[in-house]
Amino acid sequence: MNPLALIMITTTIILGTVIVMMSSHWLLVWIGFEMNMLAVIPVLMKRHNPRAVEAATKYFLTQATASMLLMLAVVTNLLYSGQWTVANMTNPLASTVMTLALAMKLGLSPFHFWVPEVTQGVPLLSGLILLTWQKLAPLSVLYQTSPSLNLNLLLAMATVSVAVGGWGGLNQTQLRKILAYSSIAHMGWMTIILTYNPTLTLLNLLLYILMTATTFMLFMSNSSTTTLMLSHSWNKSPVAATSVLIIMLSLGGLPPLSGFLPKWMIIQELTKNESIFLPTLMAMMALLSLYFYMRLTYSTSLTLFPSTNNMKMKWQLEDTKRTPLLSPLIVMSTLALPLAPILSTLN
């Protein structure tokens, strides 16, 4: 990509997200969403192949539909209340439509259909941007409007998202699809606690971005996109392969790794609000995600993955890409659990 075009695209993506996060006026929020969407499409189409074009088209159509629903909610609220303020979403119909629009942008179930397909069709770096940075703007709007959200609708979508994220990841061999379904499940965990304790949503988002970014960077350093390629990365970089497997278990929420921390605190907060059935159901469905991560760990580290005899193997003689940020990211992605006593004081 042309360096000048890359600078312009990167600046527009960052600026669009910052405008959404810093604005209290609905028109500026909508403009920020559009800037961000139009700038990220060239990033998704960087490969110039039919699969990438198809993924970018699916992303564009989904995000455009969500933006249309968001504008419908804003205009409906304006007609009833006369307010353009983000925090002043008082009309129930407008609040419901806005929740559906932001759920579509985030990839919450039942609007999750685009996330695995788009992530699978783009390069690893584009998938990293799609599953981390692109979640910031919709979640910031949900955070600002959390007191006026439709609670029952949000809880239903969050619970189904955790279930879909667990079931969808089973029997997957493509690493990008596995991370896409993991993203759907994590979005469910973030939104289910949003109306009870928004601070926990921010904590979960921070740890999710750390773990997902670290996993994608390790995949890029190993040039791994499938389970088979990941199992052969032991020859090339044993330390990186071990780190991938530990971080994947952390993504699944296995104690005592970092990924267990937000799930533990969310279940605790839901229990404090006299909700027993919901956290029990969420914990049981989280076992699905943990299962396919543990199965992936087993198939790539404890056994030899099935492969043909004439397949090219990776060796340490090959040059590995230098990623100086990986070391601190790996530490934060796996060893954040001791911070739990400090974080438990958050209100």
From Swiss-Prot:
PANTHER family recorded: NADH-UBIQUINONE OXIDOREDUCTASE CHAIN 2
Enzyme class: translocase
Lineage: Eukaryota, Metazoa, Chordata, Craniata, Vertebrata
Bilayer topology term: Multi-pass membrane protein
GO biological-process terms attached to the record: mitochondrial electron transport, NADH to ubiquinone; mitochondrial respiratory chain complex I assembly
Keywords: Electron transport, Membrane, Mitochondrion, Mitochondrion inner membrane, NAD, Respiratory chain, Translocase, Transmembrane, Transmembrane helix, Transport, Ubiquinone
Any single Gene Ontology cellular-component annotation: mitochondrial inner membrane
Organism: Cardioderma cor (Heart-nosed bat)
Domain of life: Eukaryota
Assembly description: Core subunit of respiratory chain NADH dehydrogenase (Complex I) which is composed of 45 different subunits. Interacts with TMEM242.
Protein task: Core subunit of the mitochondrial membrane respiratory chain NADH dehydrogenase (Complex I) which catalyzes electron transfer from NADH through the respiratory chain, using ubiquinone as an electron acceptor. Essential for the catalytic activity and assembly of complex I.
Protein name: NADH-ubiquinone oxidoreductase chain 2
Leader sequence residues: none
GO molecular function annotations of the record: NADH dehydrogenase (ubiquinone) activity
EC number: 7.1.1.2
Compartments (UniProt record): Mitochondrion inner membrane
Residues that span the membrane, as ranges: 4-21, 26-44, 59-79, 93-115, 149-169, 178-198, 200-220, 241-261, 274-294, 323-343
Family stated for the protein in its record: Belongs to the complex I subunit 2 family.
Reactions this protein catalyses: a ubiquinone + NADH + 5 H(+)(in) = a ubiquinol + NAD(+) + 4 H(+)(out)
